[in-house]
Amino acid sequence: MGQPLGIIAVLCLLWVSIMLTIGFCEHYESDEQLADIYSSECRSFISDEKYSIRNMTTGKTTIDGIDWLFAADAYTDSLVVYSKNFKRGYFDRYTGVNVIPAQYTHAWIFSEGLAAVVLNNKVGFIDHQGKTVIDFQFPYAKDNKKQVGLVFHDGYSSMYDATGKCGIINKKGEWVLKPSYEYIQNPQYGKRVFYDGKMYGVLDDSLHVLLPAEY
C-alpha cells in the first residue's frame, strides 16, 4: 500500500514541477528586458516593442507605452527626449520623473539650457521646466533632406523663415544672420558649413564668411 502512495506522491511532485516550469517559461518569454541605463536610479525597459521608464529606488514605473527615446549615451543633458503616441516630451535621466509630458509634434535635445519644440507647425524654445523662452514664431521646415538640428551652440541656432531660407538666431529669438541660405549646419570646431543652393561655404565662430560659397 505504501508503494502506490509513494508513486502517486512522486507523480504529483513531477506534475507540479512541470507546471511551474511551464509558467516560468511563459513569464520569461513575455517579460520585459532591460533596454538602457540612464543613471543608478533610472532605467528603461522594453516589452512588446514599447519602452517604459522606471525609478529603481522606488520600483515605480514613471512612464510607459513609449514608442522611442534617446539612448543614454546620446548626450549628457539631464532631460531626455521621448515619443509617445506621436507626441514628444522629456524625462529626468536621474529620477525617471516625467518632467515635460509628451505634447509636442517634434522636439530636439536640450543644449545650453534650451530645446526646440514644435506646436501647430511652429518652432519655439523651452527651458527645463517646460516654460516657453522663445515664442512659437518660426515655421517648421518639413524638408528632412536638410537635416538641420535646431540646437544652440555658442549662443546661436540655425533657423528657417517663412520662405524656407535658413539663418541664425540668438537666445532672444532675434535674427543675427538673416535667412538667405538653403541650410546652415551645426558647428564643428566653431565653424558652420552653409549651402546657398549651388555651392558650399563656411562661417567662422563670429558668423562671418570664412570661405565664400565657391565649393
Residue ranges and their predicted role:
Residues 1-11:
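N-terminal Sec-pathway targeting helices
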Residues 11-17:
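Bacterial N-terminal signal peptides
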